[in-house]
Each structure stands twice: as structure tokens, then as C-alpha cells.
From Swiss-Prot:
Catalytic residues (positions): K115 (n6-amp-lysine intermediate)
Family: Belongs to the NAD-dependent DNA ligase family. LigA subfamily.
Catalytic activity of the protein: NAD(+) + (deoxyribonucleotide)n-3'-hydroxyl + 5'-phospho-(deoxyribonucleotide)m = (deoxyribonucleotide)n+m + AMP + beta-nicotinamide D-nucleotide
Domain BRCT: 592-670
One of the protein's GO biological processes: DNA repair
InterPro entries (alphabetical): BRCT_dom, BRCT_dom_sf, DisA/LigA_HHH, DNA_ligase, DNA_ligase_AS, DNA_ligase_CS, DNAligase_adenylation, DNAligase_N
Protein origin, superkingdom: Bacteria
Described purpose of this protein according to its UniProt entry: DNA ligase that catalyzes the formation of phosphodiester linkages between 5'-phosphoryl and 3'-hydroxyl groups in double-stranded DNA using NAD as a coenzyme and as the energy source for the reaction. It is essential for DNA replication and repair of damaged DNA.
Binding site for NAD(+): D32, A33, E34, Y35, D36, S81, L82, E113, R136, E173, K290, K314
Molecular function terms, GO-annotated: DNA binding; DNA ligase (NAD+) activity; metal ion binding
GO annotations of cellular component type: cytosol
Protein name per its UniProtKB record: DNA ligase
């Protein structure tokens, strides 16, 4: 018996600690599934030994105490939580308990809703005006967050309609949509601020800011799902009709609410939502099932911490705890170096997970991760599993530091990480096996060396059969080798050899673009070719000389220098120089012109409908313009076609003049 008491006390201590981390500090250390498991274990032990149940046991209350920093609010009607079921068998047991208590065998109608993964709040309206908002807290006492909630545009400050009660307390969930969460984290990374592990943490942290001006900048929203206090008014006697009444008053209600009669319909709804979950745009962790008839709800009543007439049918956990055995580094098709954690296999969201992405060196540093750590791994929908946190209290003494490599693990080339960029990259773009297919596809593309007939499928076969390892090998191919490829007859093979022969005569600008140097597009390649005129001159240039070229800043200059100084790339370029040639670039002589484009750096963006992009470039260049591929402070003018995107946005941000295609045509004619 003593060991049982000790086990119960240990569980209570752990649960209280994690309740405080989750509800008070907004810094959960374990996944919800682990907390649920511990709570269920404690419930089972207390059920077996009811004499050991105490009033302060975590099983006897809803949550944790509120922060002292906020004014405390006592809920006139307690905000209870829900009991959970985790599989169909457990749900059917809940359904049977409801039927048994009501003494009926007839199918019951349930209102089924999404179980939102955010922060539960209470909104008190008096005479239609929002007068107070509070967190759930421990279910009896919460925190006054009125100033913060007033900043959430989805929440009306005043209800509208003729039948608004004198006092009504609406309950619901404040949450952060996925798109807003990603944007918030991206901005935080850029500014070196706090990055949130998931949207729930972001919503909780945003809602409980002491400065409402910070909350106002956060992309929070709200759905209501129930009522607490009701005084001086009436509501329908059906839960779903209550939700429709809230909607009529101007409160947001989820569209994914459905009446289901009988357990088969409820389970079908659960399965459908589970299937649709990844595309909702916000996090949910299950379906809430409530008896729809309010009279039956009153008849069923409550247990200590939850209603008997409702349950949360939870999805398989998207987060679990496991251990990092090793960290390896993978090279992507663009040369990006990604650290990958090798994990003790664990089942997450119904799938065995043994690997998880760590993204980059900054993420490892943010997590404070070491090899041997116990970690929280998350898998949501089709998203690649990722480590979202370290359980520091379980860190063993023999953990090892993770060391980022300085050479590519695939080809041994130097790894570069340009200041201001999170991703480290292999510089051996012409040589690295991991980048081989993409480098070759780019090299033969229409705007590069333009090898007619050399499509992606052919490149893939050439690499898979090990006929080609780098761009120089393309010019050693024979018709005999090519005829061994799928759907490649003798005539097609001869045509491809002829196309390769033709591609040997190109321009310096096309050649530079074909090399696939990071962030060197067509316009930048043309500017480099015009400025340096020969490959030797370009190779001899230092960072400052490179930066003197239009369209080349510090970052692009470093990419060019690192690429050309990499030993493996140098060998491939030397081989290419033996077979590929180009005339010396002609300096563009521009007659003195009164054209408004003369001497201006111009950027084209979006789709042009009157001229092709190449025609527009040629016309602009002939009038003395420098056509650039990116917008910077040096840009004088942006010409925006249809569906212009980020370049237009950046131009507007920098205050650069923008004209449309029609205005460009008019100015070209002057």
C-alpha cells in the first residue's frame, strides 16, 4: 500500500508542475498526450483506492492558478473542462453511459464541433456591450484580459439584435491561424526575437501580454462554443440553435458544426474532420461531442470537473516524447545542408517516427539541443516530423554537443553560410552528387545553354545510369549511349548530339547563368559578363570589385566568390572551357538620349501582355537602361505587369516609382 501512496503522490506532483508550466508560464515541457496519460494513470489509481482521493488532487479541478500580474476574476458559473476519449471503443462507452443515465435506447442527437487548440476565454456582455474578458484559470478564478481581447477584431465589442440578454457570458477559444503563426515566427527570426513552438503557445503568449499594444499586433481570432452566465434573457433549448443565436448577435462560430443522430453519424463526422484536419488552416486536436437538447444536458448534470453530457473525442497525438540518438546532415537538391535527428522510434499521429528535421543551425541553438536529449517530436498532417522542444529536466549527464560540418558530407566541398541567412549550403554546385540532377537541368535549360530536346526525364536517366556526373560530361556523350535511354531512338539521339554541339557556341552571360551560382539570375549574369568581359577577370575579382557591378550586393558577391573559388567547381569549369566558347561581350554603346529610361536601373516584374520580357529588356537596354533582376535601394523604376508579387511589394516598401506596362510602352515611344 505504501508504494501505491508513493506512486499517487509522485503523479500528483508531476501533474501540478506541468499544469503550472502549461497554464501559468505558457511553457509546456511535455506533449498533451503525455499529460493525458499521467492524468489517466492517476484517475485509475484513485478509482481503485477511493480512500486516497484528496480535494487538492489534480483530478478534482480543471487547471492551474492565474498569474498575479493580472487582476483576478471569479467566474460566476465555473468554467469546467471536458473528459476525453481516444478511440471509437471509448466513445461508444461514453454514448452508452449517456443512454443508461437517461434510461433510453433511442438514438440521441449530438452537436459535434471542432476541438480548437487555443486558449479558453469567457466574454461577459452587459446590455450588449463587452465589459469583461477572462481566461479560464483554474475554472473558478481566471485572469482579467479585457484590454487584450478588445484588440481581437473577430470579437464584437457590442452585440446586435433585439433579443440580447441583459447579461450573457459567452465562452469560446482564442487561437492563431497557421498562416499568421508562420508569419509571426518568420518575423521573430528576422529580428532575433522569441520563436513559438506551436500556434497554441503563440496564442496563449499573445493573449496574456501585459501590454495590449503587443497583443494588437498578433494575428489572433476567436470562435465561440457555449454560454455560462445568462441573466435577463432567454436562449433556445438546443445547443446548435444557441450557436446560431450567437452568430446572429455577431459572434464568430465555426462553420464545421453538425448535428449527428446516433453513434454511427458521430463517428463518421469524427473521421471526416480527421481527414480534413490538415487543410483547415488552424490547429485542432479532436472533436467535441455534446448532447444537443439542453433539457437533457440538465438531466445528465456534471461530475467533479466535467459535464456528463459532453466529451472530447481526441485525435491520435501529434506530439510525443522520445530520445535523440544521433544527428546527421543531409544535402538537398539546391545544396541546403539540413540537420536531421535520428530518434528512438516512437508512434506519432499513427505513424512510427524515427527521424525528424532540425531545419538549421539557428534552430539547434534555439532549442538548446544536444545528442542524447529527451525531446518532443511533432508530426502534423503530411508535415515532415520535427523536434519542437527539449525536456531539460530529463537531460542525462552524457549528452554531446552537435557540431555543424564545415565540409559537405556528400562531396567534401566547402560549406558557406552568408551572414543574415539561416541556411548553410554546399558550394560544390557543379560537382556535388546531391545537387547533380538540378544543376544539370538548369545548365541545359532554355535561358541557359538551351540544349533543345534535353528534358528533365533524360537528365534523370543520364544521372541514374551514371553516364553524367557534371555539366562537362554532357559534351562527352555519344549517340550510342543515348540510344540506351527509354524512348530514345537513333534519330532522337543524333538530334540531341547535334543540339549539344550547337550549345557549345553561346554567350558569356548565358554561360554564367548556366553555372547556377546562387542568386545569379539572367540580369545579374548579363551585368557580370558586361562588366568583366572574360572569365579570368571575373575569377580575379574581390568582393569590393564584384559589388561595383549593378545588381550585385554583398550577399551575391559572396555567393559568386565562394562558387568560383571552390576547387571542385574550378575543375568542372576548366573542362567546360575546353568545349564551350563565346564571343567577347560587346560593350553596349548608348547614344545620348533624352529617354526617361537612360541611366536608370529598371526591374521588370509580373506578366507582360504587349511585349515579351526579352523584347522589353532589349528595348530598355537600347535606351540606356540597366535591367536588373532584383529590387534594391539602387533601383530607380519598377515596371509591374499582371500578377506582380514580392518585387512590387518591396518597391512599394522602399518608395520606388512603379509604372504599368501601358505606361512603359508610352515612354518607349517618346
Amino acid at each position: 500500500m505504501e508504494s501505491i501512496i508513493q506512486q499517487i503522490n509522485q503523479l500528483r506532483t508531476s501533474l501540478r508542475h506541468h499544469e503550472h508550466q502549461y497554464h501559468v508560464l505558457d511553457a509546456p515541457e511535455i506533449p498533451d498526450a503525455e499529460y493525458d496519460r499521467m492524468m489517466q494513470q492517476l484517475r485509475d489509481l484513485e478509482a481503485q483506492h477511493p480512500e486516497l482521493v484528496t480535494n487538492d488532487s489534480p483530478t478534482q479541478r480543471v487547471g492551474a492558478a492565474p498569474l498575479d500580474a493580472f487582476e483576478q476574476v471569479k467566474h460566476e458559473v465555473p468554467m469546467l473542462s471536458l473528459d476525453n476519449v481516444f478511440d471509437e471503443e471509448s466513445y461508444l462507452a461514453f454514448d452508452k453511459r449517456v443512454h443508461d443515465r437517461l434510461k433510453t435506447a433511442e438514438p440521441l442527437t449530438f452537436c459535434c464541433e471542432l476541438k480548437l487548440d487555443g486558449l479558453a476565454v469567457s466574454l461577459l456582455y452587459e446590455n450588449g456591450e463587452l465589459v469583461r474578458a477572462a481566461t479560464r484559470g483554474d475554472g473558478t478564478t481566471g485572469e482579467n484580459i479585457t484590454a487584450n481581447v478588445r484588440t481581437i477584431r473577430a470579437i464584437p465589442l457590442r452585440l446586435h439584435g433585439d433579443n440580447v440578454p441583459r447579461r450573457v457570458e459567452v465562452r469560446g477559444e482564442v487561437f492563431m491561424p497557421q498562416a499568421g503563426f508562420e508569419q509571426l515566427n518568420e518575423e521573430a527570426r528576422r529580428k532575433g526575437g522569441k520563436v513559438f513552438a506551436n500556434p497554441r503557445n503563440a496564442a496563449a503568449g499573445s493573449l496574456r501580454q501585459l501590454d495590449p499594444r503587443i497583443t494588437a499586433k498578433r494575428p489572433l481570432t476567436f470562435f465561440c462554443y457555449g454560454v455560462g452566465l445568462l441573466d435577463g434573457g432567454e436562449l433556445p433549448r438546443s445547443h446548435i440553435q444557441c450557436l446560431m443565436q450567437f452568430k446572429a448577435w455577431g459572434l464568430p462560430v465555426s462553420e464545421r458544426v453538425k448535428l449527428c443522430t446516433g453513434s454511427d453519424q458521430v463517428i463518421a463526422f469524427y473521421r471526416q474532420i480527421e481527414q480534413d484536419r490538415a487543410g483547415l488552416g488552424f490547429d485542432i486536436d479532436g472533436v467535441v461531442i455534446k448532447v444537443d437538447d439542453l433539457a437533457l444536458q440538465e438531466q445528465l448534470g456534471f461530475v467533479a470537473r466535467a459535464p456528463r453530457w459532453a466529451t472530447a473525442f481526441k485525435f491520435p497525438a501529434q506530439e510525443q516524447i522520445t530520445q535523440v540518438r544521433e544527428v546527421e546532415f543531409q544535402v538537398g537538391r539546391t545544396g541546403a545542408i539540413t540537420p536531421v535527428a535520428r530518434l528512438e522510434p516512437v508512434q506519432v499521429a499513427g505513424v512510427i517516427v524515427s527521424n525528424a528535421t532540425l531545419h538549421n543551425a539557428d534552430e539547434i541553438e534555439r532549442l538548446g539541443l544536444r545528442i542524447g536529449d529527451t525531446v518532443i517530436v511533432r508530426r502534423a498532417g503530411d508535415v515532415i516530423p520535427q523536434v519542437v522542444g527539449v525536456v531539460m529536466e530529463q537531460r542525462p549527464d552524457d549528452t554531446k554537443e552537435i557540431t555543424f560540418p564545415s565540409q559537405c558530407p556528400v562531396c567534401g566541398s566547402d560549406i558557406e553560410r552568408v551572414e543574415g541567412e539561416a541556411v548553410a549550403r554546399c558550394t560544390g554546385g557543379l560537382f556535388c552528387a546531391a545537387q547533380r540532377k538540378e544543376a544539370l537541368k538548369h545548365f541545359v535549360s532554355r535561358r541557359a545553354l538551351d540544349v533543345d530536346g534535353m528534358g528533365d526525364k533524360i537528365i534523370e536517366q543520364l544521372v541514374e545510369k551514371q553516364y553524367v556526373e557534371n555539366p562537362a560530361d554532357l559534351f562527352q556523350l555519344t549517340a550510342g549511349k543515348l540510344t540506351g535511354l527509354d524512348r530514345m531512338g537513333p534519330k532522337s539521339a543524333q538530334n540531341l548530339i547535334a543540339a549539344l554541339e550547337k550549345a557549345k557556341q553561346t554567350t558569356f552571360a548565358r554561360f554564367l547563368y548556366a553555372l547556377g551560382i546562387r542568386e545569379v539570375g539572367e540580369a545579374t549574369a548579363a551585368n557580370l559578363a558586361a562588366h568583366f568581359r572574360t572569365l579570368d577577370n571575373l575569377r580575379a575579382a574581390d568582393i569590393e570589385t564584384l559589388k561595383s557591378v549593378p545588381d550585385v550586393g554583398e550577399v551575391v558577391a559572396k555567393h559568386v566568390m565562394n562558387f568560383l573559388s571552390e576547387e571542385h567547381n574550378q575543375k568542372v569549369i576548366e573542362e567546360l572551357e575546353k568545349v564551350v566558347s563565346w564571343p567577347e561581350p560587346q560593350q553596349i554603346v548608348v547614344e545620348e538620349s533624352d529617354s526617361p529610361f537612360a541611366g536608370k536601373t529598371v526591374v521588370l516584374t509580373g506578366s507582360l501582355t504587349i511585349l515579351s520580357r526579352d523584347e522589353a529588356k532589349d528595348r530598355l537596354t537600347a535606351l540606356g537602361a540597366k535591367v536588373s533582376g532584383s529590387v534594391s535601394k539602387k533601383t530607380h523604376l519598377v515596371i509591374a505587369g499582371e500578377a506582380a508579387g514580392s518585387k512590387l511589394a518591396k518597391a512599394q516598401e522602399l518608395g520606388i516609382k512603379v509604372i504599368d506596362e501601358a505606361e512603359m510602352i508610352r515612354l518607349l515611344g517618346e
